[in-house]
Regions:
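Nucleotide/phosphate-binding sheet-loop regions of phosphoryl- and nucleotidyl-transfer enzymes
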Residues: 1-241
Length: 241
């Protein structure tokens, strides 16, 4: 049953991503989600049955098609369409304003990376998160993992603030007054230790600046962790050379 839920959840997410890339608003889909939760007396979407998730996914599909943005059946057409959307994003008002403020040429264009996807929404032993390798409140030189993660969700859910998230470390939970038993360090110790090891390697061994790391894990074992992106923390003053 969980695999059916997973399949329909991904179908739902695909419909929403495609629709939003074509100009639909997140609220268009959130309204459908809220209505569906209310109809089935559900608080968290992970509590939908596979059939209920199927119904919601098809509602998303209908909403996208009603706006003229239906997804083509041919996977190759889907891929080419997705690539074209990324290219077109270079010309959005937000992107143009950013380039103007940052002094970036309009002639550069953008690249498109096509890669395999990993799934934080596989089940209750999977999840996604964002962490910082430096303490946000105290000036300490050691690596200290700080951030948020969610179980059974994708990274976009966390970044958008759509789901209830939990602290990364026990130290963070104690300082923030949150439940340390829900921290990644307590619930998924193998994942936490692997992230700590990677963070120390980047900061101590490679001498990178403090990092902001996005990650997904498809299971509770260390080898099921995937680093999606890492970049310099913008809240930390970079080292002077």
């Amino acid at each position: 049953p969980r695999s059916k839920y997973f399949a329909w959840d991904n179908f739902r997410r695909f419909q929403q991503s495609w629709g939003m890339a074509n100009g639909m608003e997140r609220e268009d889909f959130q309204e459908l989600m809220n209505t569906h939760k209310e109809a089935h007396a559900i608080h968290y979407k992970r509590d939908f049955s596979p059939e209920q998730m199927r119904e919601l996914a098809l509602n998303y599909k209908q909403a996208v098609e009603s706006r003229g943005f239906g997804i083509p059946e041919d996977p190759w057409e889907q891929l080419i369409g997705a690539v074209d959307m990324v290219f077109d994003s270079w010309h959005t008002p937000k992107a143009e304003e950013y380039r103007r403020l940052m002094g970036v040429s309009d002639d550069w264009g953008t690249a498109v990376i096509v890669q395999a996807m990993v799934f934080g929404n596989l089940g209750l032993q999977s999840g996604s998160g964002v962490l910082f390798t430096a303490h946000p409140y105290r000036k300490v030189r050691r690596v200290a993992l700080w951030g948020d993660y969610a179980i059974g969700d994708q990274g976009e859910d966390i970044v958008s603030g759509l789901v209830t998230s939990h602290p990364i470390s026990v130290e963070q939970a104690e300082i923030d007054g949150r439940d340390e038993n829900k921290s990644l360090e307590r619930r998924f110790p193998n994942t936490y230790q692997r992230l700590l090891s990677i963070s120390r390697e980047l900061v101590y061994d490679k001498e990178w600046n403090p990092q902001e790391i996005e990650f997904t894990f498809e299971g509770a074992e260390a080898e099921q962790l995937y680093i999606l992106q890492t970049r310099d923390m913008i809240t930390i003053k970079k080292k002077e050379h």
